[in-house]
UniProtKB/Swiss-Prot annotation:
Protein name as it appears in the record: Holliday junction branch migration complex subunit RuvA
Name of encoding gene: ruvA
Region (Domain III): 146-197
An MF annotation (GO) of this entry: ATP binding
GO CC term, one of those recorded: Holliday junction helicase complex
Subunit record text: Homotetramer. Forms an RuvA(8)-RuvB(12)-Holliday junction (HJ) complex. HJ DNA is sandwiched between 2 RuvA tetramers; dsDNA enters through RuvA and exits via RuvB. An RuvB hexamer assembles on each DNA strand where it exits the tetramer. Each RuvB hexamer is contacted by two RuvA subunits (via domain III) on 2 adjacent RuvB subunits; this complex drives branch migration. In the full resolvosome a probable DNA-RuvA(4)-RuvB(12)-RuvC(2) complex forms which resolves the HJ.
Annotated Gene3D superfamilies: 5' to 3' exonuclease, C-terminal subdomain, DNA helicase RuvA subunit, C-terminal domain, Nucleic acid-binding proteins
Family membership: Belongs to the RuvA family.
């Protein structure tokens, strides 16, 4: 099993990269969060790797942080969530955001990710809730999201406008912090767009 790869970045695409390690090119599937942190082709890159073995293929999944890899490993334990869908989920949500979503049972946030329907979202919430512990520190400092309708409507509007899910969540969190709990959706969206400008 391969647990770590370090080598020269040969090719970079949004869903996979090729890492050259001593003349051997490894195709590694990565979430967008890892993709955006990668250096340019020709530079050295190091990734935490999960080796996924199927009957017909061996696939490598790479992550910049241990937290991303840990969350990926938790996601693929859920019935109906394969490695590709887990990478897709991590492309739209940070491990901290996903942790909070699971603890607070915010299925509507999961359903905003392409490929995650109602049943999969419910399974993720149900099967991972007991595996998540309440974190202290940074997690405790994050403001509680506004009521489901305001937050969900604003989040959906931002994603439809073309903002990346992680970018929209971060800005919404800041807007909620400055406006207070449960602001009207129009006010929340206006403040969030101001922060993103």
């Amino acid at each position: 099993m391969i647990g770590h790869l370090e080598g020269r970045l040969r090719h970079k695409a949004p869903d996979y990269i090729v890492i050259d390690v001593h003349g051997v090119g490894y195709i590694v599937y990565v979430p967008l969060s890892t993709f955006y942190d990668l250096p340019g082709p020709g530079d050295t890159v190091a990734l935490n790797i999960h080796t996924h073995i199927r009957e017909d293929a061996i696939q490598l999944y790479g992550f910049r942080t241990v937290a991303e890899k840990d969350m990926f490993l938790r996601l693929i334990t859920v019935n109906g969530v394969g490695p590709r869908l887990a990478v897709n989920i991590l492309s739209g949500l940070t491990p901290d955001d996903l942790h909070r979503i699971i603890l607070q049972q915010e299925g509507f946030r999961l359903k905003s990710i392409p490929g995650v329907g109602k049943k999969i979202a419910e399974r993720i919430l149900l099967e991972l809730r007991d595996k998540m512990s309440v974190k202290k520190g940074r997690e405790a400092e994050q403001p509680a999201p506004a009521a489901e309708s305001s937050y969900g409507d604003a989040y959906s509007a931002l994603v439809n406008l073309g903002y990346r899910p992680a970018e929209a969540e971060k800005a919404l969190g800041k807007a909620i912090k400055s406006l207070g709990a449960d602001p009207p959706v129009e006010k929340l969206l206006k403040e969030t767009l101001r922060l993103l400008a």
